[in-house]
């Protein structure tokens, strides 16, 4: 029988967690109730399968008793212990948790530690806001609790029941990855580089399972997480735009570890300058005041783009070059001299040959070329079909060197 782990703090959410447990059990799953309470006054309940002390013993560095009296430190410590506990369990067919901001922060890292495809549901009071810090590059399903997770009432019973039946359905009707003997290639795409990525995908799909990631910060993280996990045989990183948001302050930033997976794995890597002409913000009224006088373009009512200027382009090119210098596997980086996005072309709002020239020069002077690490300028626009052909050709060359 499939096993679902129900995780939360039984000292404050006991009735809700037991309600989840009972509904999931009634749906046909076995349940393991894991208590991660951190209150020093909490007493163990006999109907809990895994007590807090058992989870805490999984922490790699046992903390002193006085440290656990600080709630912030205790939550962080229990969260780390829970990660190690869940990793040690071979029978997690699915996991569900419920909590407020503290419980969400405690439980989410353990969910992120599980492989993609293992069902994960988190009922949370903070699920209607920015959930990126909790979900990260994984497939956690977050459900807004509507009312606080504080007792059972006419609202919480319905929300929790929906969550319980959701996780049960995911586990009992789980569909494994479709049988596909093709190796997987990761690609990064933004709306303004879509023609390029679609052309590359068409050229590769007969021989490769093409996994396309939207370059929205977490998209790049997912791309690299799969590379680190051994699920990709290489990458075509067309859209490195997340670097702009990271360095300038946009809403779709990469992490400082961008390109790190390819440095660690030495997988074949082909990259380009896709959408390095822009920084992303929300609706126009959310653009920070210091950028209001810059060249802005309304992409849609919820997304405003800002053109990167020469100074920013210099920093962006240098940062990418330095990160790629850490890669010792086959690296090809192609510069499309006639424009890096659909709106970086003659007559388009972000056409700026001067800024592009600064970007390209920064890449050239920073990237240290070797037999395996190469950079090339190409007199084409990034969305020109010939540029897509060159990306495919370079990937094939990188594979021959791998």
Swiss-Prot record:
This is UPF0261 protein mll9388. Disulfide bonds: none annotated. Belongs to the UPF0261 family. The keyword Nucleus does not apply. It comes from the Bacteria. It comes from Mesorhizobium japonicum (strain LMG 29417 / CECT 9101 / MAFF 303099) (Mesorhizobium loti (strain MAFF 303099)). Keywords: Plasmid. Signal peptide: none annotated. The keyword Thylakoid does not apply. PANTHER family: UPF0261 DOMAIN PROTEIN (AFU_ORTHOLOGUE AFUA_1G10120).
